[in-house]
Each structure stands twice: as C-alpha cells, then as structure tokens.
Amino acid sequence: MVLKRVRCYYLIITIRLKMKVFTNKNLSIEQYGFINTFPNQNYILSYLHPYNPYSSLIVCYDVGLGKTYAAACLAHMYLDSGFKVLYLSNSLNSIDNFSNEYEKVVLDSRLNSLKKNITIKSFSKFYNCEKRGESDNVDYGLIILDEVHNLRESAYRYKLIKNKLDTMNNSKILVITATPMIDSKDELDSILSLTKETSRIIFSENKIDIKISYVGQEINGETLFLSEMKGQQLKEYLKVVNEENDTVYSSSRQASISLSNKFNPSIPLDEQSSKINAFINSIKEGELTVLFSFYVKRGIDFTSSVLESIGYKKWNSNKKQKRTYAVIDGRTNKKNVEEILTSFNSIANIKGDNIHILLGSSVLSESITLYRVKHLHIISPFWNYGQIKQSIGRAIRIGSHEGLEDKSMKVYLHAAHYDKEGKDIDIWKIAYDKNKDIIKRLEELKIDNEFSNDSLLDIPKIDNEMVIKINEWVWDFRNCFDTNKFKISWCKIYEDKAIGYNLENNTKIMGNIPSYIRINRPIPGGYTIWRSCIDKKLRISFIDGEVNKFSKRGKLISNVNTSEIAKDLNCENNIESIINTLKEQNRYFDKQIEYDL
C-alpha cells in the first residue's frame, strides 16, 4: 500500500494574489449575513463585489472547497443590489446544487422574489437559444459559468457562447472549474479567453486533512490496483484487441472490465472479471464503498449481478434490508438520486446499515457530495487526470468524513492486465503523461503570479491602539480621527478611512469596518468618560440634545469641576466616584477602539 496525502495526488497550488484596494464603503460583505464562509470564499465575494471595478474572475479552487456556495453568495449580493444573474453549467447535478446552495444563502422571506431574477440554463440550452436567434437580451449584472471545463467539449458551442459573452459588456463574469486543464496544457487558454479582460485566475491550497492511500503497486509512475485476466475473459480480451482498429479502445476497455453484462454463476468470477473479483475481495464490512464505472452494462450491471450472487440486495426505500447496494447512473431518475444520496449520506449509515456499496457512472462524478466513504474504486481508466480528480473529489470534501475517528480513504485505480501489459496500463500512462505537462503549466502560472507579502501589503506596525491585529486581519485606524497636535475631536470620526489588510489572501480594503470592531464615542443623553486613542488621556463629555457642556473634544477629567458633575450624577464629589458611577451606567470607555469576537 502506498500512503499519500491528498495534496500529493495532483498539483494544488496557492497563488499569492496581487493586492487590490477596495475603497467604497458599500463594499462590505458582512451586511449580507452569510454563514460559515471561508477566507477563500470571501476573497471571491470581495473581489467581484457588484461595486468593485473588476469585471471577471476565474476560480480554479479544488473540488470540495465550496466554489458553488461562494457563487451562490455572490449571486445574492448582485440580486440584493437589484441586478439579474445568469447561471450556466452543463451538469444537471451542478444546476441542482447551485439552486440548493442559494436557498441556504437566503434565510428570509425574500427567497422567491429574489430567485425569480436568476436565469439558470445548461450550456446546451443557452447555445440552442442563441443559435435559433432566441436571445433574451437581458442586461445581467453577473454571469456565472460553472464547471466550465465542460464547455470545451463542443468547438461550435464554445465559439457561439464566447461571441455572445463578448457582446454583454455590462456583465461581470465568474468562471468556475476545479479542472482548468484536462487533456492538454493549452486548454486553459480557452478559459482565459472567455473573459473580456486579463482576468485574475486563482487557485487554492487544499486544507482538507483527510489521508488518501492508493492501493496497489507503482507502474509508470502511478499506483495501480492490478488484477490479472485469465480464462474466458482473457480470451475475449485478446480477441477484441486483435480486431480493434479504433484509437479509443472502447471494446477492449469494456472487455477488461468483464466478460459480459451479467454474472454467470457457472463460470468462476475471476475468469469473468479480474477487476470485480478483486473488488469483491476488498469489501470491508462496516466501511462505505463507492465504485465508479464509465461503462454501465459491463461495469455497473455486471457488478450488480455479482453482488446479488453473494447475498447483497438492491436498496429499496420502502424496505429495511441488510447488505444493500444502490446504483446511480443515467437511468436513475432525479427523485431516486436524491433518496439514495440522502440515505447513503445519513449519519445512520456510518457503517453501511442503509447502503453499504454505491455504484455510479459518470453522472456521479460532478457536483455530488458523498460522506464517510472509506473505499473508492475506479474500474474504467480515464484518459486524463481531470476525471480522476472529479471522481475522487466526490468523497473528499470539507466535512466529508465528520463522525469518523479515522478520517482516511483508500483509492483503487483498477488496471486489468496479462503479464503486466494491457490497454488499461497504457491508458493510465497516457493520463499520467498528460498530467505532467499540465503540472508544468500550472507551475509556470504560480511563478507568474508569485508576489512578496511584504512588498504588496506594506502592513503598518501593530501597536494595539491605532493598529490592531484580529485573526487574519490587521486594521489601521490612524486616519480615522480629525486631529492634530492642537486638537482632538470625537465628533469627526471617518470610518471610511479605516484600512484592513487580510494576511491570508493579500487583499487590502478601505472603509469596511466589521461589526465586531467598535469606535467608542460619547453617548447622547448625559455624561461619557472616554480615553482618547490619540493621547491616551481620559476625557469627559456631555451631550443632551444640542447642549454641550464641554468642547467637542471633551475635557480632561483631571481639569473638570467635580462638584457640578457629582451633583448631576448624584454621587460623591470625587473623580473616582464619578468614574464608578458612569461605569455602572455603561458610559465609560477605557479604550476608544474595542473589538469583541
């Protein structure tokens, strides 16, 4: 067994982002009340804010890091500001997922009224409408292109959609993909050209602390789960290899999975399918297992019949059964998909009491989350790492292994062979070689976008008075007060001159003081004692309508006539008693700038 961290499986890089300065006071994202957004999501929301000047952003965050939720939050910001939103994706799972995520964002009665201003279409539907001249001509404030790697599948569709985007000059564009390059390092260029400007492209480091171990032995640089074909399967495989003249090896790939569409109990399993025989032998009781197969009949259908031959039953929502399996493929309707996923992901299924084994085709490989999976099998090799990454990403996400003491998963990249040779091994090698070129291109991007934190942010020295550090933020309030060496004024405080530096994503914002930071000032309706952040001295002020007993900057507490104040406050005639009385009334501030997390 080869033990690796998930970040070793494919290149995951963090690009340090060049500093952007946001100056509009309305740019705060706190006002929207988003729950549980992470720094990588907040960067998207801040950068592509409706009132920021930037018109596009390409997000290449890895699977499982909340790209769709961030897109839903961003859509809400535009809808709340009166704009319309267009969401495009070619994955029905992605479309449903985005709609569900938006419902999590809006926690009030405005959901339906806001949601009607979101147009949701597949790339194919959008393409067909444009092709027929049925453009809606809506002036969208935001266009979201999700799973954009699917847009490259059709050159004609890509060109028409790109031409349409080029005419939508007033729209901002958010491009989302976990796999910007699948088959070629040049594919990134087609994504970059979808936007109207030189777009910022951002990657993220995967901080999901789940161990992945690849089971098998290393062949051509990749850890493969080998199984040797024999008997009738090997005869069938060699026959189709000799007859096959196409370059995609469709027949031999299917033959390498199984001999036929259904298990024949009169023939030993290892002579019908070396892969499924190895799969069956790897099954562990009490540990959830997922199997992906590109081919339905020789993959999923054959595996289903094998499972039933050893006592497994197909999951039925109306029956309580033990040792069950479920299937999600192109034949599974939407309602059944939802029921299967709900049952599989339930905490009650942590040991497979509802569904032990889930079989899935390519429809399961995008925009679906699977929880607490311990074993993941890919029995049909892919031509590229993008599809591998998408499949594994279904089960490795933020919170995907909560409830398990051992947060780890085993991955089995199946390869059938004879004498360590075969089309499976060839295809895995092609994918591996492609990935080396893609990694090189990504490394070049990393170098092109590498910046120094110090040179970009120029963060002032923290003094815990006018410059304070709170978590990943440093806040500078030195320009917020109308003061010089001769005057100190509490009445003119310029909150829009506060500067915030985010140390995690290298952003700089102005005028967006979060709600947990307070700049204290005299309270109307009486006396207030406050310590000025300018000279650190205690001052007392009195405000009652238009009445000001002292100057606007207050009066030093050491210089006041205590008898008059003590009489007004009905306390003893000394400074200590006056201070204690105002403390009891919550009208005493020892620090002008306070924060409460």
From Swiss-Prot:
The lineage of its organism: Eukaryota, Fungi, Dikarya, Ascomycota, Saccharomycotina. SMART domains: DEXDc, HELICc. This is Uncharacterized killer plasmid pGKL-2 helicase. Keywords: ATP-binding, Helicase, Hydrolase, Nucleotide-binding, Plasmid. A motif (DEVH box) lies at residues 146-149. Residues 275-467 form the Helicase C-terminal domain. It is an enzyme of class 3 (hydrolase). Residues 48-198 form the Helicase ATP-binding domain. GO terms for molecular function: ATP binding; DNA binding; helicase activity; hydrolase activity. ATP binds at Y61, D62, V63, G64, L65, G66, K67, T68. The presence of the two linear plasmids, termed pGKL1 and pGKL2, in strains of Kluyveromyces lactis confers the killer phenotype to the host cell, by promoting the secretion of a toxin able to inhibit the growth of sensitive strains. Belongs to the helicase family. It comes from the Eukaryota. It comes from Kluyveromyces lactis (strain ATCC 8585 / CBS 2359 / DSM 70799 / NBRC 1267 / NRRL Y-1140 / WM37) (Yeast). It holds the Pfam family ResIII. Its EC number is 3.6.4.-. InterPro entries: Helicase/UvrB_N (IPR006935), Helicase_ATP-bd (IPR014001), Helicase_C-like (IPR001650), P-loop_NTPase (IPR027417), SNF2_RAD54_helicase_repair (IPR050496).
